[in-house]
């Protein structure tokens, strides 16, 4: 997976993405990062400035179309022989980013992220190059760099080989069946008067799997009831839901068997 980020702050992207799991994945050649400084494509007479006043007035400055377009073309031309990349513009007005969308994007070879700043970017260049406007939530940040990093981290985890344990990505919240992940415990067996659930010490793998599944069902119902109707359930799930009075929350959920 090749990530290309058009930004005014490439050092911010590089520093964050070059650590931990994503950093090791880059060293292993599973991921690559190309952070492009949009200022490098400013008109020479403007000496690196890429913003100007907004037509019609209003507070703040607007990123100009031409430097953004030049930066995009530099990336698109460099990878034109292998892909027609999606261009993702970080915007609170866009499609909400979720695990399903991440899985879709993880199938791409190259992704271009466009990070805005100031009061926004000239609409004309957005209309010309952007394929997807994407939001990570109903709030406003100072720039698109943090949303881009959130998306890149989520997508990177789905690239084969990035996680040392491939099962990790499949058992986490929102994956596959749409449920939240079950609670996790480690040593010691007792901490601050709280003991690890005995079932996890039993050695009965089938019982452990069932307990974890039931905890996922309960946790989703309690913490994210909005997800229940999109869950994928089996017969044992349905029985547990009936026994715990959760039918209404899970009404409409899909059947696995």
Spans of model-derived segments:
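N-terminal nucleotide/polyanion-binding subdomain common to many enzyme families
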Residues: 1-78, 201, 206-229
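Hydrophobic/aromatic beta-strand patches that form the interior of the parallel beta-sheet core
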Residues: 4-6, 34-36, 88, 111-112, ...
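Short, solvent-exposed amphipathic alpha-helical segments in soluble enzyme
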Residues: 20-25, 103-107, 129
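Gly/Ser/Thr-rich beta-alpha loop segments that engage phosphate groups in nucleotides
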Residues: 59-62, 96, 118, 122, ...
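S-adenosyl-L-methionine/SAH cofactor-binding core of RNA-modifying enzymes
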Residues: 64-117, 123, 160
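Structured adenosyl-cofactor binding patch, chiefly the S-adenosyl-L-methionine
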Residues: 121, 125-170, 174
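Long, charged alpha-helical interface segments
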Residues: 175-232, 236-239
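Short, amphipathic C-terminal "tail helix"
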Residues: 232-257
């Amino acid at each position: 997976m090749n990530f290309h980020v058009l930004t005014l702050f490439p050092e911010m992207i590089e520093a964050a993405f070059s650590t931990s799991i994503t950093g090791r994945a880059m060293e292993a050649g599973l991921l690559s990062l190309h952070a492009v400084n949009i200022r490098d494509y400013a008109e020479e007479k403007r000496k690196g400035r890429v913003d100007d006043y907004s037509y019609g007035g209003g507070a703040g400055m607007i990123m100009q179309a031409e430097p953004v377009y030049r930066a995009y073309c530099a990336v698109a031309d460099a990878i034109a022989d292998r892909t027609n990349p999606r261009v993702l513009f970080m915007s609170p007005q866009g499609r909400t980013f979720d695990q399903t969308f991440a899985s879709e994007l993880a199938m791409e070879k190259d992704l271009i992220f466009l990070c805005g700043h100031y009061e926004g970017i000239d609409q004309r260049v957005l209309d010309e190059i952007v394929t997807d406007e994407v939001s990570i939530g109903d709030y406003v940040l100072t720039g698109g760099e943090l949303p881009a990093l959130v998306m890149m981290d989520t997508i990177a985890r789905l690239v084969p080989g990035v996680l040392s344990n491939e099962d990790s990505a499949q058992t986490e919240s929102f994956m596959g069946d749409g449920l939240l992940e079950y609670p996790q415990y480690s040593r010691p067996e007792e901490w601050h008067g709280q003991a690890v659930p005995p079932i996890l010490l039993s050695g009965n793998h089938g019982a452990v799997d069932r307990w974890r599944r039931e905890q996922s069902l309960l946790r989703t119902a309690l913490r994210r009831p909005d997800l229940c109707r999109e869950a994928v359930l089996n017969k044992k799930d349905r029985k547990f839901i009936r026994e715990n009075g959760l039918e209404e929350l899970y009404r409409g959920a899909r059947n696995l068997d």
